Amino acid sequence: MDKDVPVSVWPEWELIEKIGEGSFGKVYKAKRTERGRSFYSAIKIISIPASKGELDSVRSEMNNEQSTREYFRNLVEDCIQEIYTMEHFCGNSHVVSFEDFKVVEYLDEIGWDISIRMEYLTSFMDYCTGKELTEKEVIKLGCDLAMALIYCRKLNIIHRDVKPENIFVSRFGDFKLGDFGIAREQAHTMSNMSKKGTYSYMAPEIYKGEKYDSSIDIYSLGIVLYKLMNQNRLPFLSLDKQLITYRDKETALARRMAGEKMPAPVNASASFSHIILKACAYEPGKRYRKPEDMLRDLEKLRLAPVNAEKEWEKSQWELTNSAELERDQRRYAPQKPEDCMERTHVAEDPQIEKAVREEEA
């Protein structure tokens, strides 16, 4: 085990290695062994304050030690809010599942460690390493995360940090939304807020400090899909340059925040481009107003090849059966009287037939 990996607050769970960092914390892979079988979880540890430097900085601004302690205690309550948010989603197949948590307060100093145990998943960044996602896979990702946002909306929760680093993949290939570290109930976030979140996927109204609603998560999801279908480049970044500079990123961000019309992502079909560009429209009123609406269009696109095949099979069936029906109609159509008489004569006794011919002569 890595010597820098801390000891778990759950004796039965051993922390093996650090696998990432999220909002205000580090994430570790943990293992529990029972009856010869190994089970795995992800444990996120949030330390408040994050460092001695942060503690000293706050101390210098506060009047006394009690005020300093209360300041950091409020941060602890904010982090516990993330835990309560995750509890709402227990059993949801498109949100990272919460399993348990513990809060430990230091005895000899101002500080807390918050441990959150969650299901162990593959990070989206690792999932994408060494391969390029097909449009079909990206559409599925869009569908899965749109379903996650539907549950957020039902609970009046805005995630505010939808980005590849907060997307995870289950062993069944389902995409999940995680890290609700800056999520807040919508009732408390409708007015101007701090610019928490990632600029690369941030909606313009947050960037400009304006009022916003849950459509900002739809915008961020749209930018995620855009990048995946645009050779892993954000809007307005050159597709020809191998090396993208900091200035390139700043210029691209400025153009996006100014409302310049985005070009279509180069690897997306026309139908998928329409969905993506609508999701990340500059004006909130021109976006999908609800994740349900975006999911509906994504599902139509996802099923389009299947529906087209079904329509082709139906048309072939109709053509085949139409031809067979026409043959049957010709075969069993009513006959002319003279045809019937002629067939009757042929079927008569030869002697009678001879007599009839002689009589006609």
Regions found by a protein language model. Give the residues of each.
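Conserved catalytic-loop aspartate of Hanks-type protein kinases
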Residues: 217
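Regulatory extensions appended to serine/threonine kinase catalytic cores
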Residues: 306-361
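Short beta-strand micro-motifs within the conserved protein kinase catalytic domain, predominantly
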Residues: 97-112
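Conserved short submotifs of the Hanks-type protein kinase catalytic core
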Residues: 109-124
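Activation segment signature within eukaryotic-like protein kinase domains
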Residues: 141-142
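Catalytic-loop of the protein kinase fold
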Residues: 153-169
